[in-house]
Every structure is written in C-alpha cells, then in structure tokens.
C-alpha cells in the first residue's frame, strides 16, 4: 500500500521537475499546433458545450478533441435519458449537433470517401442532423411556459422502436439502420 500512496503523492504533487527546457509540444502529430488542444473555461466563460456546427452550412470546421468529448457526453446523456423514457426533457437540436460533430470526426478519422460507400451515408446523416439542428435550435431554446415542447408527446418511443426494427432486419450492421435509429430518436 505504501508504494501506491507514494505514486499517488508523486503524481499529484505541486512540484514540477526542474528543467531548463521549454514545455514540450504535446501535439507533435498536428502541424502548427504549439498549445495543447484542451480548453479550460476562463472566469466568466460558460462551461456548457456549444456544438461545432453553426447555422451557416457553408462554414464548417472540424471539432477539437475537447469538443468531441463534450459531444460524446451529450449523446451519451441523451441515450441514458431515452432509456429512462425522459427524452421530452432533451434539447434535441443540441443532441443533433453533437451527433453530427461525432459523425464528421468519424468520417475524417476513417478517411471515408464522401462520394461512395459508407462515407456518402455518413455525409447524408451529418447533413440531416445539421439541418435538424438549425431548424429546431431556436424552437427548443425559446418559449417559456407549457407550449415550449410542442410535439413532445411520446418522444421516448422513437429509439426503442428503431432498435426493434434493427433487430428484425437481422442484426442491422448496415449504416442505414443507424440512420433510421437516429431519425427515430429525433421524432
């Protein structure tokens, strides 16, 4: 046990090793990066996730690692809420934007061709999610009172129904089944 506590103390101690070298570049694989890609909100800066996608479809920039992790957290929380049948409490536009960011990163990471194969389906799904995000972003954040969630009745049934369809189709290892599931979730 002493070895473990010594290692923990060493890991979390405030002392930094004495070195005259400048701090190393931890982003060696990314040309032009001299700073780490993590972002810690400053004083007065909001800590909520803002999806990378925006309302202008011509402007598209890749998500940073921190933004992708935040997007993954949003999607995971949405999946948990859907499993608890609480999807009426979700900001579906925010979830759509986060999902689109993850799909974009997957297509870039996998170097998938946007014109053929799975890449074209990823691109279509990403475009659909961005369109959903832009068309529903102002309606889900605006509106106070009981009419803020129009059409939210039975919102949790979309994902389980899509999952049942997926099971009926023989396992559903195709991307089309995932797109159907995402579309069913957004209803």
Swiss-Prot record:
Expressed in roots, leaves, flowers and siliques. Residues 142-158 have a biased composition (Gly residues). The keyword Magnesium does not apply. One of its GO terms (cellular component) is mitochondrion. InterPro entries: Nodulin-rel_1/2. Residues 1-66, 132-176 are annotated as: Disordered. Coiled coil: none annotated. It comes from the Eukaryota. Induction: Induced by P.syringae pv. tomato. Repressed by heat stress (42 degrees Celsius) but induced by low temperature (4 degrees Celsius). Slightly repressed by NaCl. The keyword Acetylation applies. Disruption phenotype: No obvious phenotype under heat stress. Impaired resistance to avirulent bacteria P.syringae pv. tomato DC3000 (avrRpt2). Prevents accumulation of abscisic acid (ABA) after heat treatment, thus reducing thermotolerance. May be a negative regulator of the ABA signaling/synthesis pathway. Required for defense responses against avirulent bacteria such as P.syringae pv. tomato DC3000 (avrRpt2). PANTHER family: EXPRESSED PROTEIN, NODULIN-RELATED PROTEIN 1. Interacts with RPS2. This is Nodulin-related protein 1. It comes from Arabidopsis thaliana (Mouse-ear cress). The gene is NRP1.
């Amino acid at each position: 046990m002493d070895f473990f506590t010594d290692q923990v103390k060493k890991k979390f101690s405030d002392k930094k090793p004495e070195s005259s070298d400048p701090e190393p570049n931890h982003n060696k694989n990314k040309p032009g990066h001299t700073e780490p890609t993590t972002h810690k909100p400053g004083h007065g800066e909001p800590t909520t996730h803002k999806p990378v996608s925006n309302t202008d479809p011509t402007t598209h920039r890749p998500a940073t690692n921190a933004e992708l992790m935040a997007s993954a957290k949003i999607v995971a929380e949405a999946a948990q809420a859907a499993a608890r049948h609480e999807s009426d409490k979700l900001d579906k536009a925010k979830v759509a934007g986060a999902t689109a960011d993850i799909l974009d990163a997957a297509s870039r990471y996998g170097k998938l061709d946007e014109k053929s194969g799975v890449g074209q389906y990823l691109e279509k799904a990403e475009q659909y999610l961005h369109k959903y995000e832009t068309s529903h972003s102002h309606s889900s954040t605006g509106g106070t009172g009981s009419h803020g969630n129009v059409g939210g009745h039975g919102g949790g049934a979309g994902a389980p129904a899509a999952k049942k369809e997926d099971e009926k189709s023989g396992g559903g290892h195709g991307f089309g089944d995932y797109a159907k599931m995402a579309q069913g979730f957004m209803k």
